[in-house]
From Swiss-Prot:
It comes from Cytophaga hutchinsonii (strain ATCC 33406 / DSM 1761 / CIP 103989 / NBRC 15051 / NCIMB 9469 / D465). The gene is murC. Disulfide bonds: none annotated. ATP binds at residues 119-125. SUPFAM superfamilies: MurCD N-terminal domain (SSF51984), MurD-like peptide ligases, catalytic domain (SSF53623), MurD-like peptide ligases, peptide-binding domain (SSF53244). This is UDP-N-acetylmuramate--L-alanine ligase.
């Protein structure tokens, strides 16, 4: 890949969270940037407001002329784009410089010291925490994130990397084996629960990909993994450490105390204890995320005091246990959880902060294949809520699979307080229920209901005051 003669960058799927981060990087580095997406969203509107040309019809007639000049345009696409996409096929068949998002991310980060955050769950929160710590420490830091951070209201940070100074924090995404394009100096693996079995032929192939990711570690690099993550440490790693609650962990999480909606804990290592580590978000999964970010920043050279202060000031990520509405009578939490393990962690975190409260969950399953592959696990996780409104499966890139429906999933859930709802009936059904906490969860288009549900909460109890 050579950017010497590139003046314009065109992104097919520009509204995706990872793609939009690349779009913003190129725009802030003075490239002409534009792209296509299937539907308008808050994110695409933000990109347009930042000066990028975005359209929503798959047609070369819609592509501005500047992005059709073969010698000066770079075309980037996401693997979520269907194979019959007209624009993608035009650029491919006519020999344009065409790359996947992951290839471009690998290219942009290869000459810089990189922290790669991998794992089925928690990548975005951990990456955002690590980036915030590095940024607050004064160390030059760039970050390509899979969510909008509350601290910076963006999914990208751009640092001054003159003479290769500082660090890049990048999400190492296992989907489509994208993380094999990265060569991290510090490789973090938070967890390794099987997912994306529509991409991987079987569970073992999924696990094997993480070993392949670690082989990409730069010579002398460091591996940080949760203690129960079973991987092969490459011989060229200079150090491999584990973290977790277990006595076997090199860095052991201790003294976990839930208070005021957040968590305080300590980390023990050999004869050293780091006390009073505080995050302003609930859940043991976030304690794990924070510990991974803590260790990544520690090995990158940030002081312990600076790490602790930054974790305390970390404001979270949009759609990751995000409080949409909160007062003394009613709380509304929105979350991106779309895997059974994530749903379980979300519901346990809600129980941790709001013990004894009645919880209603609105869940939109994401992908027919994921619903099929984890049907029993979804049923077990969703049984943790008091009442369930289950939406129809969001197909994303997939066609329906016979016998895989929300009704089939509903029948497996060991609960009587449950119902399948359409998008049209969701608000009406929710309005009928009494609850103390309402949760929306999913990775599809459930986020379009956030504001209507917030309005319902306000109509019931007035403006939020917490």
């Amino acid at each position: 890949m050579n950017l010497t003669h590139i003046h314009s960058v065109y992104l097919i799927g520009i509204g995706g969270i990872g793609m939009s981060a690349l779009a913003r990087w190129f725009k802030q580095n003075n490239y002409n940037v534009g792209g296509y997406d299937k539907t308008s969203s808050d994110l695409t509107k933000a990109l347009e407001a930042e000066g990028m040309a975005v359209h929503y019809t798959d047609s070369m007639a819609e592509v501005p002329e500047a992005f059709t000049k073969k010698d000066s345009v770079l075309v980037i696409y996401t693997p979520a784009i269907p194979a019959d996409h007209l624009e993608l096929n035009f650029f491919r068949e006519n020999g344009y410089a065409l790359y996947k998002r992951s290839q471009v991310l690998g290219f942009l980060t290869k000459e810089l010291k990189t922290i790669g955050i991998a794992g089925t769950h928690g990548k975005t929160t951990t990456s955002s925490m690590a980036a915030h710590i590095m940024h607050e420490s004064g160390m030059p830091c760039s970050a390509f994130l899979g969510g909008i951070t509350q601290n910076y209201n963006t999914n990208i940070l751009i640092g001054n990397h003159g003479d290769g100074a500082g660090w890049v924090v990048a999400e190492a995404d296992e989907y489509d084996r994208s993380f094999l394009q990265l060569s991290p100096d510090i490789a973090v693996i938070n967890n390794m629960d099987p997912d994306h079995l529509d991409i991987y032929s079987d569970v073992q192939s999924f696990y094997d990909s993480f070993n392949e990711y670690l082989k990409k570690l730069k010579p002398g690099g460091i591996v940080i993994r949760r203690v129960d993550v079973d991987v092969q440490i490459p011989s060229h790693a200079s150090l491999s450490v584990t973290f977790g609650e277990s006595v076997e962990a090199d860095y052991r999480i201790q003294n976990v105390v839930v208070e005021d909606g957040g968590v305080t804990f300590s980390i023990d290592h050999d004869f050293t204890r780091w006390n009073n580590i505080r995050i302003e978000m609930p859940g043991m999964h976030n304690v794990m995320n924070a510990t991974a970010a803590f260790l990544a920043a520690h090995f990158a050279g940030v002081s312990i005091d600076s790490i602790k202060a930054s974790l305390r000031s970390f404001g979270g990520v949009k759609r990751r246990f995000e409080y949409i509405y909160k007062n003394t009578k009613l709380v509304y939490v929105d979350d991106y959880a779309h895997h059974p393990t994530e749903l379980e962690a979300l519901l346990k975190a809600v129980r941790m902060v709001f013990p004894g409260k009645k919880v209603v969950t609105v869940f939109q399953p994401h992908l027919f294949s994921r619903t099929r592959d984890f049907m029993q696990e979804f049923a077990q996780s969703l049984a943790l809520t008091d009442e369930l409104l289950l939406m129809e499966i969001y197909p994303a890139r997939e066609l329906p699979i016979e016998g895989i429906t929300s009704d089939v999933l509903l029948n497996l859930i060991p609960s009587t307080n449950k119902k399948v709802v359409s998008k049209e009936s969701l608000l009406t059904e929710l309005e009928k229920l009494n609850f103390d906490v309402v949760i929306t969860a999913g990775a599809g288009d459930i986020d379009r209901f956030i504001q209507p549900i917030k309005l319902l909460c306000e109509q019931r109890y007035g403006k939020a005051n917490g």
